[in-house]
């Protein structure tokens, strides 16, 4: 065999798997079709957060008087400079990924790969043999195939999230189809940049994967920024920059200079089409608990297996899959219920474990403790009191079942809850820990102390 391992894709799952394999002396080849660093680094997590940080600064400037600051003169948005900074960040991190791969003594090739059989991969008209294959080919935006959509896409009116990060200017009117995580983040971004934003959502609230209290707070915040949210709306067609939809059977329309379609993502599994892998009734490739396909030397990790489309979940799967090949059992499998997730709105949303909605659906007994950030000295000092911390506990043992944080720094705080859940700590362990004061983090401790008084004393 030419290699011990061939990895298709150098995104978060693939390059971490490559690094781990290389450092464990596996002769490894990684093949990347387009982006070293994947969607996340090039046209996803990193560039959006770069722009959202600038949007947050704009929000601070708009509300400078609330902080006792008077600005003389007009602050102007330089969109081209923002895009330049975004690309500089991306380029720097892409270079870092390539350095990681090279440093692990892993070979790399640019090109589109196809798996010929369980031991052969073809790229750039050359076939390579291998003992193991890891597929980490990621995902792509899902499109709507409705009347007029293809024409509107070709004309540049209807765009996806990748195109939204490379617009020539800030659109006056920006329409978002889909009120999930990606759609809501872009709504915040362009509303802060000055666009008139409308969200078209198919169900009765945005962020439907979250509890209703989360959706309500973020909806209120968006509306305060001038964003119009239309729920229970079903998109039916497009005519250039005009989007038609129905609410309760009545057809309406909205005009947008740009219309972002953000309705989920599709796994890139085409490289496996020549194989007869076991699939379920939805044509999804079936995996076992070791992330192996029915051909057991072929693994699927990251977005392509659709388990949880998050970069940090992919990181863990990358290490875990290689660990299975090495038969070392040193890396724990990624557990969905202990993996945190973040939404980079302003304030941010972060959660881990069960939501209340999930606990109720699965009929799991729980008690809840929560506090708004108006109880936090640091939040008051920072003028950042919009949000709360809530946690759910096993009423008998005090085990933490889940938690949600809405705060200006929620994405930084949630790691504390994830670590606690990963190590099976309880409400008592957190309540007995000492948090620095004043910080936003101490609200987690305060919520646990409140829970003990309310339920466990």
Swiss-Prot record:
Full protein name: Dihydrolipoyl dehydrogenase
The first-level EC class reads oxidoreductase
Q: Which UniProt keywords apply?
A: Cytoplasm, Disulfide bond, FAD, Flavoprotein, NAD, Oxidoreductase, Redox-active center
- Which Pfam families does the record match to this protein? Pyr_redox_2 (PF07992), Pyr_redox_dim (PF02852)
Q: Which E.C. number(s) belong to this protein? A: 1.8.1.4
Reaction(s) catalysed by this chain, per the record, are: N(6)-[(R)-dihydrolipoyl]-L-lysyl-[protein] + NAD(+) = N(6)-[(R)-lipoyl]-L-lysyl-[protein] + NADH + H(+)
* Annotated GO biological process: 2-oxoglutarate metabolic process; pyruvate metabolic process
What the record says about family reads: Belongs to the class-I pyridine nucleotide-disulfide oxidoreductase family.
Location of this chain's protein in the cell: Cytoplasm
Enumerate the cofactors the protein uses. Answer: FAD
The free-text function statement in the UniProt record for this protein reads: Lipoamide dehydrogenase is a component of the alpha-ketoacid dehydrogenase complexes.
Q: How does it assemble?
A: Homodimer.
Residues that hold FAD according to the record: 32-40, 49, 113, 303, 311
Q: Does the keyword Mitochondrion apply?
A: no
Q: How is the cofactor bound?
A: Binds 1 FAD per subunit.
Name the active site residues. 437
Single GO MF descriptor: flavin adenine dinucleotide binding
Q: Give an example GO cellular component term for this record.
A: cytoplasm
User: Which amino acid positions bind NAD(+), per UniProt?
Assistant: 178-182, 235, 262-265
Which InterPro entries does the record cross-reference, listed alphabetically?
Class-I_Pyr_Nuc-Dis_Oxidored (IPR050151), FAD/NAD-bd_sf (IPR036188), FAD/NAD-binding_dom (IPR023753), FAD/NAD-linked_Rdtase_dimer_sf (IPR016156), Lipoamide_DH (IPR006258), Pyr_nuc-diS_OxRdtase (IPR001100), Pyr_nucl-diS_OxRdtase_dimer (IPR004099), Pyr_OxRdtase_I_AS (IPR012999)
Q: What else is known?
A: The active site is a redox-active disulfide bond.
**Chief localization class?**
cytoplasm
Q: List the disulfide bonds.
A: 40-45
